């Protein structure tokens, strides 16, 4: 039967005539040299051009090759020059005249720093690129153009050449003369290539006589001649993996011949003109073709190698028709790292009469099936004796070790048991593939049917699906149906099916409805897979080794290249994988972890607890993440050994004790910040404060202290934030603290915000307005003297600041009120309620109506409520007032300013200024000196002397009870100094007379 060929076109590009092609060994690139003098590099996966080189305009580039280890391309053209380029940087590395005529071919030595070039000058030359591209040997012997060269893969010191003198000559790099000559073609020979597989000493040639000849270079005879082309044969090669000979001709076709039977298997014609060049990538299934009209890349066959492993660790694989065996058990006592290539000894097991395209052990490992060339053969696994054979496009084993099925054609399926046919049936659709396992699966282009192995009855028909593969679990309870886009995990109810069959009910076209249930869909493209218990292990298109338990997918490893799963061996606890070159690696698979996860998914928590002690410590974190994903966060917190993960779980569970313990161990500001936020949200104020301090979360501390009214905390935060340079926090703290408004002005001035400082003083601290205005004026002089002169000081221009004297009185009034403890506010609140019951209060009117005598009286009586125990004494300043100013209304503002002398520090505002980037204040602003008409601001020395003259120490409180140290942090009312439009009535302040006063201390005032 014909060889099953899976041919896919990976690239097709249009261009000028392509004289040579070469495939990169590691990148998905093909190099094409053109008749127009250009060289292109194409990516055959993305279909895009990667690089373009203009090598020799108007001179054909007849040959080009990759030198991958140097990241070079080397070209030969009709101008007789060899040129070398770096294909990454596009830099020209070397250019030299190599021959006296057109350069026809260049090949690169697989290991040594050599290239060979041939030319129409009839010479072959050897070049050493590690020695400055020196010419180390010249080979002479042909009498016509030398068209092609090929290295012998079995002896890389030898090479063969083809010439238009109708001969093939075999050479050694150590001798300038040929060892022997092969003659037989009637016309010039265009191409020569060695057979790379097996032990056959063959080479192949194609010539202008339209023939392809196979030569035995040991006996120096022609073994076979292939006829079929209708024009000159331009190029020939052996497929690197499949038993194929490929030949390209000027008749526009590529013919595929079986290398053992020499039967023509397939003819390809892509309508792109003459075939000029062909190249293969050793170890792969990619073939590059160069045509008159462009470049084509084909993938012939599948990458999956013919290899199988039994439960004992014996690996049987095929190298062409040769069968070899290795034993994994020799490595079980060795310490092997995950992903490490295993060093295995192999031995010949025998040969196979067909070319193996698939190779499979049965369930007990006693027999091995080989399928290929449209036939199957069953061998004994140990002695490699033929047990059975027959025709088959595909072969699959059943779960029962003695049953198997073959697909003879698209219309005939046969089932065998103990090497005897038991059933033969014709599906109702075109059978495009079959799958083994607990049931026999048969697919068409859009349908999947499952059949009973014993009766061939349909069990279930699934429409609109055509899987790539099906993997059954060992107990037959689960299966994975792999499609192009996703994989479906199904549960098979064998007991339900068995009862239905035993009931004798007829089975319809769709089979038994309750035979399967969809458990989960894995949205991933899967290459190979296998089951270990109820765990499905697979490799996806991204070369990730994953396993799926229930609905949870876990990545075991990221593979460096695509690999294929072989088997899991319980005795070693490892998974074994193979690449396409039959290099075998392994990865540790912890069955205890999978068993634990399976128990959790089944709800068997007691069973999971029994398994937990068997799980290694280095796998506890993966278990914890699994438990978290399943909603068992408390259990995950117990199991996890990762501090970061445990902290996250403790935060989610609001377990403050565990979270605090972990935060202390790790000493992480981030952890303290998260813990502080959580503690604050659930009312653990003390813990929140400690965590926010350790995290240096100043905004969080500000929120905490303002919410709880912690004045000591506010003081600490004001100092800390200033040290840390977060002056916006410091500003807000001082804004809310009693007697700290001056610090706010200091902050604004330090940041250069003199205008804001002046306006803030005008609103909340009128006594500081002159000083702030002067600083503002001074700051403007360097930029705009005109703007500086336009600013007015309330001392120099009192007419521009009406009622300025009232704002100063209000400042003193509210300063006294703010200096009281909470207990005094409760008393005043009761007294005020009596007044409010009579009429509505108007605070502005009260302030304007206060006489100097009343003001002094209030001030003296409020001294008894000053905070001197644990906070600070209130230092008030006053001066002898004019005894004659007892009138209710102040008619002369100027005289009042002459008589008032004070210092102040108050709190309040809602204004905030971001001054994080400003410098710290070098020294705090001085309290203002007494303001007198037509006087300038007093010097600091004078201010200090005046303050010493008028400072009054607050007397002790009358009430011996402890003073409440917490202050009420309430924004101070804005002092509006705008003049009222009409005269305000005198305020009723008689309630102030009721404030108890210690008369023994009154004389001090």
Curated annotation (Swiss-Prot):
PROSITE patterns cross-referenced by the UniProt entry: WD_REPEATS_2, WD_REPEATS_REGION
Coiled coil: 829-853
Region (Disordered) location: 908-948, 973-1005
WD repeats by residue range: 13-54, 56-95, 98-137, 141-181, 184-225, 228-267, 349-389, 391-426
Low complexity bias spans: 908-918
GO cellular component, one term: Golgi membrane
Keywords in alphabetical order: Coiled coil, Cytoplasm, Cytoplasmic vesicle, ER-Golgi transport, Golgi apparatus, Membrane, Protein transport, Repeat, Transport, WD repeat
Membrane topology: Peripheral membrane protein
Main location as per UniProt: cytoplasm
Alphabetized SUPFAM superfamilies for the sequence: WD40 repeat-like
Gene3D superfamilies: 1.25.40.470, YVTN repeat-like/Quinoprotein amine dehydrogenase
Subunit-structure text: Oligomeric complex that consists of at least the alpha, beta, beta', gamma, delta, epsilon and zeta subunits.
Primary role: The coatomer is a cytosolic protein complex that binds to dilysine motifs and reversibly associates with Golgi non-clathrin-coated vesicles, which further mediate biosynthetic protein transport from the ER, via the Golgi up to the trans Golgi network. Coatomer complex is required for budding from Golgi membranes, and is essential for the retrograde Golgi-to-ER transport of dilysine-tagged proteins.
Cited PANTHER family: COATOMER, COATOMER SUBUNIT BETA
Protein name: Coatomer subunit beta'
Organism taxonomic ancestry: Eukaryota, Amoebozoa, Evosea, Eumycetozoa, Dictyostelia
